[in-house]
Amino acid sequence: MVVVEKKTNKELNFNVKNHIEIGKQLDILDFEVAAKMSGSGFPLYKGKGALLERALINFMIDYHLKNFNYTEFFTPFLVKPDSALTTGQLPKFSEDMYHIEKDDLFLIPTAEVSLTNIHKDDILSLDNLPKYYLGYSACFRREAGSYGKDTRGLLRVHQFNKVELVKFVEPEKSYDELDSLVKQATNILDLLELDYRVIELCTGDLSFAAAKCFDLEVWAPGEEKWLEVSSCSNFEDFQSRRGNIRYKNSDGNTDFIHTLNGSGLATPRIFAAFIETHQREDGSIRIPKSLQPYMEISEIK
């Protein structure tokens, strides 16, 4: 169910290109060279494309840190099986994860895994709640179930960058925290001047770990479709029970904490929608004011 839809950009009245065409024309994306070195599903950003990717990441990190009291972490990209079990990736999604058999370690599909496991087997003090954690990571997904889906360009890749937001909160406050998590992510989309919508997932579409989830989608005019760029979820005590993450409540009793997470945001589809939305008829890309301090240019041409 669509709960918010915000379309403020004027419809482009020229021959609109998709991100693959724009990337090739401006020499900022090279999927052919990436495929030569790694196979399909791996992007190669170059020149001002690499600059834009890095600017998006740094802008997102800085925005959340400056405005919402997050603590930043730079976590391992490899985790043990029990860490992936805590957050719900194992055993159900083992086929979608890259596994290093010799060391029995998994490449993380999201920094949610490592951020949540910071407090595995901990008892947190009520005085120190809520805890807001942020982490940038590369993310790795085999996309084993992607047959028949649109995998062109940046739409579905095996390696991508993402800024992740994780919260540890008192149970009675977790749904208010979910609403604020969604707002924090959509604020980024507003500042990037992208059209977007927020979808509340029905029970049948929820992951087995989540109690409630909102998906954020951006409009990509070159693709002529909505692209999912974030999921914001309240897991209630699902992850905390698996990871034995507890807190002492106001009565002095020990109880399981509620965990939430959201992408704030994942970059590949943001990158695609960004260059499609801000393309000009002359082939250049306009850079919104929010990113100009990070790129020190006002356009890519």
Give the positions of each predicted feature.
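TRNA-recognition modules of translation machinery and tRNA-sensing kinases, especially anticodon-binding
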Residues: K7-K301
